[in-house]
Swiss-Prot record:
Tissue: Hemolymph (at protein level).
Family label: Belongs to the attacin/sarcotoxin-2 family.
Superkingdom per UniProt: Eukaryota
Propeptide: 21-34
Cellular component GO terms, alphabetical: extracellular space
GO biological process: antibacterial humoral response; defense response to Gram-negative bacterium; defense response to Gram-positive bacterium; defense response to insect; humoral immune response; innate immune response; response to hyperoxia
Organism of derivation: Drosophila melanogaster
Name under which the protein is recorded: Attacin-A
Tagged with keyword Signal: yes
Length: 224
């Protein structure tokens, strides 16, 4: 209950910051955008390719909008297909989203997230976020995850994320992810990226385990 209260306070504080920050000027009257069918295909070093297909519809303009999306994602070689949907609100870089996913035989997840833009000069972008999720595994085991993080992105496709997660009754975990764009097609639809990740349990029964590291080189193509 105490951690839930802390998360609620954090959400309220984040939206207070959002209201205090100046809004970017709008680019015109609100308009209804057409539905967009898109997706991506990314090579996976472990085998096959990670494919995603999504249908998106937004109402608004680039600075102020509501976006709904349904999607399906999976590996072409193995594993079940994850399906889900997202409803997101954005106002000059600040916003919130709700996401529900279902992976047959694995788990169901319902996640709530709020974010605020801290810096954006057209080349560098930095966002802060808070999140909470309710997770149910196929065997019936349920657990919660909540936390906060920072997301950085560069106009050339590079990026990094630092996330602190709390699993009530289990422990806390710190994670770092990075991405370096090595090549992009002229329209940026196809990219070659080097990715890396590191995570470490900082409390709980897994705190004595060594950090987990990962790296990969992936070719991705986005369409839609």
């Amino acid at each position: 209950m105490q951690k839930t209260s802390i998360l609620i306070v954090a959400l309220v504080a984040l939206f207070a910051i959002t209201e205090a920050l100046p809004s970017l000027p709008t680019t015109g009257p609100i308009r209804v955008r057409r539905q967009v069918l898109g997706g991506s295909l990314t090579s996976n070093p472990a085998g096959g390719a990670d494919a995603r297909l999504d249908l998106t519809k937004g109402i608004g303009n680039p600075n102020h909008n509501v976006v709904g999306q349904v999607f399906a994602a999976g590996n072409t070689q193995s594993g079940p297909v994850t399906t889900g949907g997202t409803l997101a609100y954005n106002n000059a870089g600040h916003g919130a989203s709700l996401t529900k996913t279902h992976t047959p035989g694995v788990k169901d997840v319902f996640q709530q997230e709020a974010h605020a833009n801290l810096f954006n000069n057209g080349r560098h972008n930095l966002d802060a976020k808070v999140f909470a999720s309710q997770n149910k595994l196929a065997n019936g085991f349920e657990f919660q995850r909540n936390g906060a993080g920072l997301d950085y992105s560069h106009i050339n496709g590079h990026g990094a994320s630092l996330t602190h997660s709390n699993f009530p009754g289990i422990g806390q975990q710190l994670g770092l992810d990075g991405r370096a764009n090595l090549w992009s097609s002229p329209n940026r639809a196809t990219t070659l990226d080097l990715t890396g990740s590191a995570s470490k349990w900082t409390s709980g029964p897994f705190a004595n385990q060594k950090p987990n590291f990962g790296a990969g080189l992936g070719l991705s193509h986005h369409f839609g």
